[in-house]
Amino acid sequence: METSNFVKQLSSNNRKTRVNALEALKKYLTAKQFKENKQIEFNKLWKGLYYAMWFSDRPRPQQRLANELGELHGLYFDPKDNSTADELTTNDKAFIKFSRGFWKVMCFEWFNIDRYRLDKYLLLIRRVLFSQLKYLQSRNWDKKLVDEYIKKVLRWLPLSGSPKVYTGIPIHIVDILLDEWERLLKDGDEDDEDEENKEEEMRKIAESAKKTPLADVIAIFQDIVADYNNSKVLREKIKEDLFSDTRLVSWDILEGETQHNDSSNESEEEEEEEWKGF
């Protein structure tokens, strides 16, 4: 696939050109030869998709492209894979490599994104995170797959706590994680104005959330907070905006009062001890 021409076509304002490029991309992604490629080929592909987003310069095409790029993860889902137990399928392995490719490119290119382009990349991250979680859900939250995703995707880079990852990325994940998880669990119906129906929907979401590996994902953030070497800004953001979210309590992911309130004081004490004087 010729990357430069492909990028221009995918970011084109001409609908027909854009649709044709997208269809060609889908065929390329699902070809057996590509799925079995090494990680570097997935990274190269995402570098091209990153620039397709870069050159998309109108609001509606940007939103549409963010949706389309996110939905590419779903191409690797095959219902037949749900009958395969205790091993990752070829599709699962391709999904992991495709997911890693996205986060690698985003984390390493983040410093180059100017303020005029920032919003569309924040939207892209939101759409991609949702689609990655959607794939896991489609695979019935297969434990081996979820563990692989957490270890080789989330903990590997975007939520590694590494100083090489600009804090804007994990902070954005903190902002969107529970909203996207809740969207994943909704039936897809339009918002109902009836208060009783809303309460019933919230009960259903809470019950569904308990059956997901959300606690395993939250554990990543707990580890980040527990490590005082990680960014104080990020740790405070996690405690204030994620751990304090009432949904985690209503979904039985966290207890009402966690020890993270205490760890805030401990964190401050440790950082005071690190002061070297004049």
Swiss-Prot record:
It is found in: Nucleus, Nucleolus. The lineage of its organism: Eukaryota, Fungi, Dikarya, Ascomycota, Saccharomycotina. Present with 6960 molecules/cell in log phase SD medium. InterPro entries: RRP1 (IPR010301). The modification Phosphoserine is found at residue 267. Residues 265-278 have a biased composition (Acidic residues). Belongs to the RRP1 family. One of its GO terms (biological process) is rRNA processing. The gene is RRP1. The modification N-acetylmethionine is found at residue 1. Keywords: Acetylation, Coiled coil, Nucleus, Phosphoprotein, rRNA processing. This is Ribosomal RNA-processing protein 1. Residues 255-278 are annotated as: Disordered. Required for 27S rRNA processing to 25S and 5.8S. It comes from the Eukaryota. GO terms for cellular component: nucleolus; nucleus; preribosome, large subunit precursor; preribosome, small subunit precursor. It comes from Saccharomyces cerevisiae (strain ATCC 204508 / S288c) (Baker's yeast). The keyword Manganese does not apply.
